[in-house]
UniProtKB/Swiss-Prot annotation:
Pfam families documented for this protein: DUF480 (PF04337)
This protein's name: UPF0502 protein azo0627
Source organism (scientific name): Azoarcus sp. (strain BH72)
HAMAP family in the record: UPF0502 (MF_01584)
Annotated family: Belongs to the UPF0502 family.
Transmembrane parts of this sequence: none
Gene3D superfamilies: Winged helix-like DNA-binding domain superfamily/Winged helix DNA-binding domain
Length: 226
């Protein structure tokens, strides 16, 4: 396994297949440690699960292998060659690359595999990976992920008709965050009153400003390695 130190990612811009593969590796390290690290076939099965996945995907072996190769190049995944083993197996490197303890790995895996969620949803769904004493503990993890450089999670504007704020991962880059905000604006246009729509438009504008700040921070960080 290559252990040569690498510069931290200046920004995240993983595609959906890469996010799914990375999320599966983190999840299975918790849930099936005896079968970890994972082969390509095991990763295909995990990526295309019909449960605990949003959205459900149908990735081919070639697509999964391409995602693995990209993650290997980013040092987010490594290959582990086992004595006497003929099949290549892979493990994630989030703990080493981004100093993520188990609680943060569990929350990030859920966000990668199931999309934006509330702290309450994250607490209940993380039970098999990491037990949180209360919602405040989840919120503390989300806050810490958001304070990383570059940030790994962010809060979304409150969706129409809901009381709780959802959080999403930022491994897809600032564009993914902006797309999520645009989706909320579209949902608002479908069935909310003018007052609520104006409120949501203000929230989207605020989020766009945060995206611009994130991009500026990414550019500044990237210049350190040019």
């Amino acid at each position: 396994m290559d252990t040569t130190p690498a510069a931290p990612d200046a920004s995240f811009d993983l595609d959906p297949a890469e996010i799914r593969v990375l999320g599966v590796l983190v999840e299975k390290a918790f849930l099936t440690p005896d079968a970890y690290p994972l082969s390509v076939n095991a990763l295909v099965a995990g990526c295309n699960q019909l449960t605990a996945r949003e959205p459900v995907m149908a990735l081919s072996e070639g697509e999964v292998q391409a995602a693995i190769d990209s993650l290997l190049a980013r040092r987010l995944v490594s290959r582990r060659d086992q004595a006497g083993g003929r099949v290549a197996k892979y493990e994630h490197q989030l703990r080493l690359r981004h100093s993520l303890p188990p609680a943060e790995q569990a929350v990030l895996a859920l966000l990668m595999l199931r999309g934006p969620q509330t702290p309450g949803e994250l607490r209940s769904r993380s039970e098999r990976m990491h037990r949180f004493d209360d919602i405040a503990a989840v919120e503390a993890v989300l806050e810490h992920l958001g304070e990383k450089y570059p940030p790994m999670a962010a809060a979304l504007p409150r969706a129409p008709g809901t009381k709780e704020i959802r959080h999403m991962h930022l491994l897809g880059g600032a564009e993914a965050l902006e797309a999520a905000a645009e989706g909320l604006a579209s949902a608002a246009a479908g069935g909310t009153g003018r007052g609520r729509l104006a409120e949501l438009e203000e929230e989207v504008q605020r989020l766009r400003s945060e995206v611009a700040e994130l991009r500026a921070a990414f550019d500044t960080f990237r210049q350190q390695f040019d």
